[in-house]
Regions:
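A generic structural signal for alpha->beta connector loops
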Residues: 10, 63-65, 89-91, 154, ...
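SAM-dependent Rossmann-like transferase core, predominantly class I methyltransferases
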Residues: 2-42, 48-59, 214
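Residue-level signal for inorganic ion chemistry
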Residues: 29, 114, 143, 201
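Conserved SAM/SAH cofactor-binding pocket of Class I
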Residues: 31-105, 110-113, 119-124
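Mobile active-site "lid"/loop adjacent to the S-adenosyl-L-methionine
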Residues: 115-142
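SAM/dcSAM-binding transferase cores
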Residues: 191-236
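General small-molecule cofactor/ligand-binding pocket signal
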Residues: 14, 67, 93-95, 181-184
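Conserved Class I SAM-dependent methyltransferase catalytic core
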Residues: 18, 22, 138-194
Length: 236
């Protein structure tokens, strides 16, 4: 059973009611994204869940305004609680809304998303977990339409996907006018196949940077893993 909370160095994530708990791959993605947000002033987190990604980015930015959109009522309440208790409460906002219907005046410089996974896999008995884990509620096509509508010209977006779905998404993104800039394949160990892909897209075509990130080797965290998460994890 997952813990009801996850303590980071500078913030706490309550996760009693949110269907999707803090995971290692989500933490890696949050840290990786936070290094790429840079001086962006307006950031959007689509499908915020507990607010993990929002707070990881907030920790690494000085004055970025981060809006977190979440459709599930219990997850939204928990994210709002996590935001209020954080050191960055004044510049992180929780918006309970369907991203398809979400409207905003000023477009975003950077969009991050850890969308529903496993649309073809066996569903669980929990409706909330199904909503979080399956893509019937928000398809990749609908996600891309929302990103295209909300991202300003010259902006970037980053997405975490199961590796077996990344090629499909890259094709869809290209048709929507987005070019892949970076791709990181995440592996549990050197002997395991990649299970997650961290992808960065923009409007301009560039030479794609591709790499691998291994979480553990010889039962210890790798140097790459530690470098990304040492500012977040308590015991690194």
């Amino acid at each position: 059973m997952a813990n009801n909370y996850f303590q980071f160095k500078q913030f706490l994530i309550h996760q009693r009611y949110c269907a999707m708990k803090v995971t290692t791959d989500a933490c890696l993605f949050g840290a990786w994204v936070a290094e790429r947000v840079g001086d962006c002033k307006r950031v959007l987190d689509i499908g915020a869940g507990t607010g993990l990604l929002t707070l990881m980015v907030a920790q690494k930015t000085n004055d970025a305004q981060i809006d977190a959109v979440e459709i599930d009522s219990e997850a939204a309440k928990e994210a709002a609680t996590n935001f209020k208790a954080s050191p960055w409460n004044e510049r992180v906002d929780l918006i309970r809304e369907n991203i398809i219907k979400y409207k905003v005046g000023d477009l975003y410089d950077f969009i991050i998303t850890n969308p529903p996974f496993f649309n073809n896999d066996l569903k669980s008995d929990s409706n909330k977990r199904n909503l979080a884990m399956h893509s019937e509620a928000l398809s990749l096509d609908e996600l891309l339409v929302s990103i295209e509508r909300l991202l300003k010209a010259g902006g970037l977006f980053a997405i975490l996907l199961p590796t077996h779905r990344s090629v499909e998404f890259e094709g869809k993104a290209l048709l929507a006018g987005f070019y892949l800039r970076e791709k990181v394949l995440v592996k549990q160990t050197p002997k395991h196949p990649p299970f997650r892909s961290m992808l960065l897209f923009g409007h301009e075509q560039v030479i794609v940077t591709e790499s691998e990130l291994v979480i553990k080797e010889n039962d210890s965290y790798t140097a790459d893993f530690i470098a990304l998460l040492k500012d977040y994890y308590l015991y690194l």
